[in-house]
């Protein structure tokens, strides 16, 4: 290896520059996407000072030998790198330590330590190394390739051979020793390598292709050997191998890149994912630019390679745009964008297939909370498998491969105890979608998804932010302890269904730190195949309720989890049901994983998790929103009412609702049958019939109250009512027709006070009543207890005559009426009296006001319609005329006849008094008539309305 690498790095650099200066080659190769170009330019600008020629010269002189060796080793890593970026980080950390020590370790040590990285296709050490290596390699290659591609071939071949197979200890040891030089090499000519590679990439020979094939075979053999050691490696390893082979050899061009000048190119590709990670560990600044250059180069390479690069780009691009790899840095803030987290997580998702569980633990270190999540090897395996396939192959193959891994996963998962069966798949899917939507994710990913509180170690947020995940599936990793068994196969949701969905970060943390970031914004097009739309942003990877069992093939309850951290104490933690994947694989997966991966379902989950995981209904799906019973029952599983209640599991209540905390033991295998609303009797145990944990839409089925119990309750109510005689006599006499269920609703509930305020004792108290006391609003109508209460509204004496059969009929008829809401809101006398009394008083006042408006006149109306003036006695002529007439009539005219009186006060009108003449010409004192008109607009004498027009003669 060393002998092949020439020590005159500066010369190589010069050669490389010469190649780069070749405009034709550059133009020809310059086919990479705008994104990459932008990133490359940005990186070059940012890091120009770091990568200045003088610095490069010095670095070259200082680390020629080490870099050269490193370059060879990098090939090896680079190959690994194709598989995935995630594992690289852990390997980088390990190897960086060695590098810092700069101690030449024995070949065996190096091989073993590096074997992890090498063994896993995604080992990240190659990333950082590849970056370094590529730059060095570029130096070597320019000499070899620019003169002739042939020279490069032997070297590249040897490099390739070492690159993948661990057996080459030389490369490993040299690589380990050389690692310290990463900084120099990585900083060095980020862009040069790209261009040069482009020129070289065109040079491909049949020999190179053959070498690629051989190399591929070797890798497969190694992979099989590695997987033979893993517990459930059989299926996943095959998938991994196939995906691996596809990634490495999906296009011969890719292999050519390895073998030939393309090799540098390949390195560049690897670099974006791995170089970033490792370099960042060593030199954050340099790593980003390197990544950019590498990404560009990758783009120019063949399709499969580009895809791989795309994965890297997605991670990288996010990071490249400004986030130096902080995956290992604990200084990273929880607020860092999800892009960053997603990238890191994704790399984790891409974890090497060959990695052991302990190694995986290292990888899962979370940026924000470095708690290491020991993920079992099984999880890792399946994850890398699907990931590799998704990354390597085009989006279509990705979905296929993903499905394959899922299937294999189903078998493998049982062996893996607490690992959510689908989380890895999700991660892979996430990778897949990420590859397809790298451009989208580059600029900004959805904010990092909140991590579940550490109190719920079992709820490790799902490792994968699959496209489906983005939809807000409670992450499968969250499944565990919560009693609601719904293995989320949502991970199995069609991987390809949401290519454009920003992937939610795949959380591996089993510790569920409570620091929840903003929920991932629903991806625009990301609707699970089930057709359920993205749930609220709140749909954070929440409850692990195993939806798999419950899942209706077509109904995807995206559980929007009202995302309360599932701290043991927080009863509010709502888990949402992960959307049920419609894919059959998911179904079987969920069931298989159910036994093994789900926390022992047979044993009732500890009450604490139960209380914490209260499932709220998904708002969009609740056709009959009944938030009530959710709060009511301790751990009510909000069945999003998608048209059917999924009463998958009987929930026998262990405690008679001493508190809202739910402590219902979950029967080990929750029945997977889904009852539709129409015929889903809510399982109200007879003893707790009043506790309508899940209120089914059909009242009759729900009502399981025995006749004698109903009669007893009625009697109790009647007695209570009799204790309040004032209320009793206030009730209108019961009318027989009112007993009919169809009687005009609301009329028979005249006096709500019948419901006495005495709290019911023990079993009498229904769940919704308890909810009412706790201030929870009740469902629009409660089937079971409600009937008896409705009966109570009828006249007490006749209650015992009410036939039980009629009661269920009442509910459907009354469902839409407001009084039902009052009843459901609280049948305790206390709750009812206040609202009803207030309403009655308001009605009285309203009636009075309306009466005033209808009968009385405002002062303005009075002034407008009447004629106020000073009273004047009629002229003598008029009196004389009257006297004459009266005399003629034989009557004596007296003075009294000539005087006018106010008919209201019956006093004679005096000269100069304020009087008001109404349109009817009647005259009154202003004071007297105004008081009258305020209450009645009509004349007190003739009852003519003052609004009428005055006669013209007046």
Swiss-Prot record:
The catalysed reaction is: S-ubiquitinyl-[E2 ubiquitin-conjugating enzyme]-L-cysteine + [acceptor protein]-L-lysine = [E2 ubiquitin-conjugating enzyme]-L-cysteine + N(6)-ubiquitinyl-[acceptor protein]-L-lysine
Chain intervals for the UniProt region annotation (Ubiquitin binding): 867-869, 917-921
PROSITE patterns xref list: ZF_RING_2
Q: What is its EC number?
A: 2.3.2.27
List every stretch annotated Disordered: 50-175, 193-276, 318-346, 364-452, 485-509
Binding, Zn(2+): 902, 905, 925, 928
Biased composition annotated in UniProt, kind: Low complexity: 112-131, 232-251, 385-395
Motif stretch (SUMO interaction motif 2 (SIM)): 305-311
Where can the motif SUMO interaction motif 1 (SIM) be found? 280-284
* Compartments (UniProt record): Nucleus; Cytoplasm; Nucleus, PML body
ZnF segments: RING-type:
902-943
Family matches, as InterPro entries: RNF111_N, Znf_RING, Znf_RING/FYVE/PHD, ZNRF3_Arkadia_E3_ligases
Top-level enzyme category: transferase
Q: Which GO terms describe its cellular component?
A: cytoplasm; PML body
- The UniProt regions of compositional bias labelled Polar residues, in chain numbering, are 50-66, 328-337
Q: Output compositional bias ranges, type Basic residues.
A: 485-496
Instruction: Describe the family membership recorded for this protein in Swiss-Prot or TrEMBL.
Output: Belongs to the Arkadia family.
Q: Write out the function statement from the record.
A: E3 ubiquitin-protein ligase required for mesoderm patterning during embryonic development. Acts as an enhancer of the transcriptional responses of the smad2/smad3 effectors, which are activated downstream of BMP. Acts by mediating ubiquitination and degradation of SMAD inhibitors such as smad7, inducing their proteasomal degradation and thereby enhancing the transcriptional activity of TGF-beta and BMP. Specifically binds polysumoylated chains via SUMO interaction motifs (SIMs) and mediates ubiquitination of sumoylated substrates.
Q: What is this protein called?
A: E3 ubiquitin-protein ligase arkadia
Q: Which organism is it from?
A: Xenopus tropicalis (Western clawed frog)
Lineage start: Eukaryota, Metazoa, Chordata, Craniata, Vertebrata
